[in-house]
Amino acid sequence: MALLIITTILWAFSFSLFGEYLAGHVDSYFAVLIRVGLAALVFLPFLRTRGHNLKTISLYMLVGAMQLGIMYMLSFHAYLYLTVSELLLFTVLTPLYITLIYDVMSQRRLRWGYAFSALLAVIGAGIIRYDRVTDHFWVGLLLVQLSNISFAIGMVGYKRLMETRPMPQHNAFAWFYLGAFLVAAVAWSLLGNAQKLPETTLQWSILVFLGVVASGIGYFMWNYGATQVDAGTLGIMNNMHVPAGLLVNLAIWHQQPHWPSFITGAAVILASLWVHRKWVAPRSAQTADDRRRDPASSE
């Protein structure tokens, strides 16, 4: 849980840094390429094939391509249509995607308690930024939702792989980032605009920070933390970036939120986490234990 909180704080700066200094100035495909390329370099020394078959390696590369490569390309392009605060708002459905996709991958029936606690988090994040949208609402909304789904598939896929095809986390992330880099390299070669490369030291510095720290270290901490909690807690923590990101926007770029809705929404998100950990997760665990005992007692 602590790793998820630390990463949320770290990522709160990423939204504003990209939105304020790179979006519209630097080609989004190049930004993705550099960001995941630097992250891949961080973990390149841990790339190992011994003891892991080709299918397992390919699956870790696939979840990296989904969670980072494709997700970044969609979300970075969305910055052309949305403000930072609007983009933050439109990510609030991610907890629902995480919960639903985890149940599908686990071949389980939908756990309505998990969906309920995730829905509370969605409501809380929505309260924070309900008041205004731009003319590009529908295009931005579509791009961000596709990005959210890609992120959720990758994150849940990584969690499931660690449950079914485990390998040391640092080795797994070496393949994870390599998968993301390959997707980004293909996209840049086909769609990139070489006329819109970074021109200032500040832009390059931000890209290095986003690649090495926010992506390289941040996603490792996030996905490692994801293996330590249940899917419901994971989905709710994913929505904490909304108030965190808006606070950073306020503190550094002096963007003023609507304080009553901000405080109310943040409180609802925190309440959803408390409800989930207090009631939903224990009840789900108890139900699973009961189901395991029933076949044994019938024998």
From Swiss-Prot:
A single cellular component GO annotation: plasma membrane
Statement: the UniProt record of this protein carries the keyword Cell inner membrane: yes
Domain of life, per lineage: Bacteria
Membrane-spanning parts: 2-22, 26-46, 56-76, 81-101, 110-130, 137-157, 172-192, 202-222, 233-253, 256-276
Disulfide pattern: none
Localization per record: Cell inner membrane
InterPro entries given in the database record: CO/AA/NH_transpt, Diverse_Substrate_Transporter, EamA_dom
Domain (EamA): residue spans on this chain: 3-128, 139-274
Catalytic activity: biotin(in) = biotin(out)
Membrane topology: Multi-pass membrane protein
Annotated keywords: Cell inner membrane, Cell membrane, Membrane, Repeat, Transmembrane, Transmembrane helix, Transport
Any Pfam family the entry gives: EamA
Function: Uptake of biotin.
Record family assignment: Belongs to the drug/metabolite transporter (DMT) superfamily. 10 TMS drug/metabolite exporter (DME) (TC 2.A.7.3) family.
Entry protein name: Biotin transporter
Source lineage: Bacteria, Pseudomonadati, Pseudomonadota, Gammaproteobacteria, Enterobacterales
